[in-house]
Amino acid sequence: MTEIINVTAREILDSRGNPTVEVEVAVGTGDVGRAAVPSGASTGEHEALELRDGDKGRYLGKGVRKAVANVIDEIAPAVVGLDASDQASLDARMIALDGTPTKSKLGANAILGVSLAAAKAAATAHGLPLYRYVGGAGARTLPVPLMNILNGGAHADSNVDIQEFMVVPLGLPTFAEALRCGAEIFHALKKVLKGKGAATGVGDEGGYAPSLASNEEALAVIMEAIGQAGYEPGKQVALALDCAASEFYDKKAGKYELEGEGKRFDGKGLVEYYAELAAKYPIVSIEDGCDEDDWATWKLLTERLGAKLQLVGDDLFVTNVTRLSRGIEQGVANSILVKVNQIGSLTETLEAVRMAHRAGYTSVMSHRSGETEDTTIADLAVACDCGQIKTGSASRTDRIAKYNQLLRIEEELGGAGRYAGRSAFEALR
């Protein structure tokens, strides 16, 4: 019934105007699954390889014709005839066909496109929504949105070093109310920034990208916006940071340079800097607080703040069970950011989430800075019982599409659904 009968691919554009891969998989029932692959701006060194053409005369070298050709000429002949419902076997076939640790032969963008499209085709053939097909009967938890309303770092042209400042509406009763809360704070922040004469253009993920004096000023204006929107900081709305520290780490000197503030820290100094921010503001989560290979400082950070805050490994773990296993063994971080294109297949993504949950780590389903209208991660957040999702601000359709899909899922679940709310973070207390 769900035998794969055809696989095709094409080059489309993502939210930054860069090419990406879109794949369609058809199964014997006549159902077709379509998936578009996201792309990151700040990427971890240990991520699976996103195959680009490198032809500078076309899309500045970022074309994906090679990856598209690999889907059509290499992957399709190997998977036609396989059962799309057997996700593990399908993904294993593609991984073996590639034969490299980072999927550099065929491209993680090629493999992932087929992996996700096949899951969608199988779900449709079985008459199930994707979240139910992947997550089973128990998939009913709507995630807390970590809404990136102010951008810095690699996501914006400004002097703010921390990459993302997020509002976390954890004290609301439903996902719909949490989303409304985040949107109202987003609009209030625009007024606050305008009042200060700051720019209100948005960055890659839909958050404002003003030029502010310091990271702390960014936190202060968000706190003001929360109040102006009529919400209570700490009780109804918390804050989260994605520091993307690998972007401001000087590997040779072993120092962290916050150029926008004129500050330079060793590992211990950086940890104390975060501790001071957490003591002053209602921060519940810090992502990538240290460089992806600075395990010693990660350990210091976890020992200092791990009992109080969610410490999320993104570039640190890259959705990879080998790196996550090392983190668990060493007691580093207490949460994993989940990005399907970091590892390059649905099966491996699910394995990483399961490993994290078994170890008592939380998980945060995440978009990339280069997105499309594809809403797969919204379904996966519910399917994997992540309890949290990062998919940008309350602007840009590529971000809103995921939130709208979660609204549909919440409506479909009705009384059986539950909003994770504060419970998504309570395991850390």
UniProtKB/Swiss-Prot annotation:
InterPro entries the record matches: Enolase (IPR000941), Enolase-like_C_sf (IPR036849), Enolase-like_N (IPR029017), Enolase_C (IPR020810), Enolase_CS (IPR020809), Enolase_N (IPR020811)
Cofactor note: Binds a second Mg(2+) ion via substrate during catalysis.
Cofactor: Mg(2+)
Subcellular location(s) per record: Cytoplasm; Secreted; Cell surface
Positions bound to (2R)-2-phosphoglycerate: 163, 339, 368-369, 390
Record Pfam families: Enolase_C (PF00113), Enolase_N (PF03952)
Gene3D superfamilies referenced in this protein's UniProt entry, alphabetically: Enolase-like C-terminal domain (3.20.20.120), Enolase-like, N-terminal domain (3.30.390.10)
Keyword terms: Cytoplasm, Glycolysis, Lyase, Magnesium, Metal-binding, Secreted
Catalysed transformations (reactions): (2R)-2-phosphoglycerate = phosphoenolpyruvate + H2O
EC number: 4.2.1.11
GO cellular component labels: cell surface; extracellular region; phosphopyruvate hydratase complex
Annotated positions binding Mg(2+): 242, 287, 314
GO molecular function, one term: phosphopyruvate hydratase activity
Record-annotated active site: 205, 339
Primary role: Catalyzes the reversible conversion of 2-phosphoglycerate (2-PG) into phosphoenolpyruvate (PEP). It is essential for the degradation of carbohydrates via glycolysis.
Name the record gives this protein: Enolase
UniProt organism field: Anaeromyxobacter sp. (strain K)
Lineage: Bacteria, Pseudomonadati, Myxococcota, Myxococcia, Myxococcales
